[in-house]
Each structure stands twice: as structure tokens, then as C-alpha cells.
Amino acid sequence: AQYGYDEINLNCGCPSERVQKGSFGACLMLEPKLVAECFQAIREASGLETTIKHRIGVDHQDDYPFVQNFVGTLYEAGCRTFIVHVRTAFLKGLSPRQNRDVPPLKPDYAYQLKKDFPQAQFCINGGILTLEESKTFIDNGLDGVMVGRAAYHEPWMLSRVDEVLFGEEPHEIRRKEVVEQMTAYLH
């Protein structure tokens, strides 16, 4: 909190070997009670809202009850905001890059989590390429959307968020301005 952060996100979704060796990332989904303890310790020590980003499964443990149990354990520990990357993380056999493309997207899991835990907020992540897609997810009951690579490759798309998602008047901005504003965050 002393550094001006609004929240802390515990990422339980990264499948890289380097991250696994440190017992971080997606492999943590195999230990939901440990993640719940970490969540509570982080929230208590920081005093900040703490969120969890996770996949829908790990390796061949990717049926809905697996992710439902993971989220349920965290929900019981007090977590109320989940960012759901709607792909399974394969810890062996796929590179991090392949893990972003090869496992199929299962957005129905995010919708079902929202139904099962209606008091929690669920943001969907994974394979979202346009603001129009984002709006569809929100219009259909999810609380938010996390856009990754699409925003990285086309940062100027973010200039239309208020227009597309919230119906505000279009705000014209040149790509050069977007890059200049984004550069301030890269240093």
C-alpha cells in the first residue's frame, strides 16, 4: 500500500517451466489450500484487495469440478475477484507460447463460475481480440474482461474502450499519442 498500489493479483496461471521450478504459477492450482493461505497472508499483510488469476485446469485435471473446487476454496478464504484464463495450462509438453494458443478456449467455465459464485466478480481472459468480443462477455453476465496480447499488439484499441463498452462519445486519438502515453509506463 505504501507504493500506491490499488490491489495485488496472485497469478496462478503461468505454465512456464521456470515459474514451476519456483512453485509459482499454474502449478499452484494443484494446491488450492496453499493458495488460500497465501491469499489470506497477502491480503492481511498489504491491506489491499487481492485477486486471483487462474486457468480452468492443469494438465488433464481440466473438468469443471476441478476449477469449481479451486475457486470455491479461494472464495471461502475471502477472495471475491477472479480473472479466469479460460484455457487449461499444460505444465509439460507445451511451451508458454503454445499454452496461449493450443488448449481450446472454454468460456462456458467462466459463465458457470459466475452462476455458482454470484457474489464474486469474474473477469474472462484468453483469446479475446476485440472490444466487441469484450462487450459480448460483459453483456452476457461476466463482470469484466482482461485483454492481453491484442492490447499489446494494438494498444490504440484501448482508446475505444469507453465508446464500445460504455456507449460514450468517440474520442479521437492518434496512434502516436497512444504510444507516447504507453511509453511512460514502460520505463
Q: Across the structure, where does each feature detected by a protein language model lie?
A:
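Alpha/beta enzyme core
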Residues: 1-24, 32-120
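Glycine- and other small-residue-rich loops at beta-strand/loop junctions that grip anionic moieties
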Residues: 27, 31, 99-102, 125-127, ...
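Alpha/beta catalytic cores of nucleotide-metabolism and tRNA/nucleoside-modifying enzymes
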Residues: 37-40, 45-47, 58-60, 64-72, ...
